[in-house]
Amino acid sequence: MTTFVIVHGAWGGGWEWSPVADILRGHGHRAFTPTLTGMGERDHLSHGEPVGLGTHIDDIVAVLEFERLRDVVLCGASYGGMPATGAADRAADRVRLLVYVDGLVPVSGRSAVDLFPARYADMIRDGLAEHGPAWRVPMPAALFDALIPAGSVPEAVRRDYLDRIRAHPAASFTEPIHLTDALESVPRAFIRCTAGGYAEQAGGDPVAAGAAHALEAGWTYREINTPHDPQVFDAEGIARLMIELAN
């Protein structure tokens, strides 16, 4: 039995990985899908208050500690690669494997926005300058349409996702991550989503550098033929890959 902790991406919540968690549990594993502060059902916690990357790292470390989890396969999807990495660094003794699911691979001293295409990086920095550190950035409609195009899934599924999307605490995008040598003791793997689509709309692919680094560093590397959000398009497939990597 493996214990999985899956960290969701920007604008989402633990809810979006629940189907994958159910599949993992059906195979006899434990699975946790925590929601980061200010997102999903915890959206209300960021109203009027800045929420940075450090808080999101605290969220994941708290799950590991309070649930008394050890030998964990910690998975960071998209933006979730940032807090997952920070948590693996702080709680390296609890993490067996750190898996990036088309996730951001951070560089110590830099922030998520440093990895973003210029159009979105500028939008976030300008919004924070105008509205202050508690500003929450809405998901651009064009980005949602590129991530889950009309007709790619049943319309009811697409509407349900859109209904649960929440504005993301912008400060978490701009707060730099600071890593220690502890992270080097944690094995890492990368799952690349190859069916593209959103990068053209975004003006660049923010996870491409991490995927290239994974190959250069000799991490275990796998691919899945889905767009950027595999939990939407192939929950069974991404669950199988996670189990394969855990073994």
Predicted regions located by residue number:
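Conserved HGGG/HGGXW glycine-rich cap/lid loop of the alpha/beta-hydrolase fold
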Residues: 2-43, 65
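Active-site loop/oxyanion-hole signature of alpha/beta-hydrolase fold enzymes
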Residues: 30-32, 36-73, 89-90, 112-117
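Gly/Ala-rich beta-loop-alpha elbow adjacent to hydrolase catalytic centers
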Residues: 75-80, 84
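Flexible "cap/lid" loop of the alpha/beta hydrolase fold
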Residues: 89, 95, 99-141, 206
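Active-site nucleophile elbow and catalytic-triad environment of alpha/beta-hydrolase enzymes
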Residues: 163-182, 205
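Catalytic His-Asp charge-relay segment
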Residues: 185-193, 220-221
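Conserved loop-alpha-helix segment in the C-terminal half of the alpha/beta-hydrolase fold
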Residues: 195-234, 241-245
